[in-house]
Amino acid sequence: SAGHMQLHHKGRLVIGVENTPTWVFDAMKFLVIDLGGTVGQIGKGLHGTAFEHNGVKTGPAICYEGLYGDFYGGFVRRGAQFMAIISNDGWWGDTPGYKHLFSISRLRAVEHRRAIARSANTGKSGFISARGDVGQTLGWEQRGVITAEVPLNSELTFYTRYGDCLARISEYILLLSVLYYVAYRYKRRNHLVK
């Protein structure tokens, strides 16, 4: 939109670097190494915001936000037709870490049926289809420009609609099962049950 700036405030901060309580940070300054970013407690947004340009809505996930499937789905629930992930993967070095982040992006594409354009300053950049297929990519510290036709999708998957509800239900069932087992063992030990 001409003349209108759209903002997204990162909603999921990197624990230990972007999200460290000040009392911990002050006490442990001697352990902190400079990774080229901000260290300490920085502000964060509440949820993903979909940007709109020429009638197309994009979900602009920043770095670690792509690790949280339900949070990531917030972009889609707010209308994102495709996702754009920007990331600073440089602090991983040439380790499997940056490759793992790219793989997680593939999982998010499948969960929400959204194509992804991922741009990492030193890590792996590329295009991922809504099925998780990888298109053109640039590898570790590889400079270049890649382009692709990015299909748009407005339909919501079950996971996008309901998020982690199945996982939460499973957690409650497990908790109730453990409590039942403990109560049963207690009653049995005290000869209250035959």
List the predicted regions and their residue ranges.
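Selective detector of the "anchor" transmembrane alpha-helix that sits immediately C-terminal
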Residues: 161-186
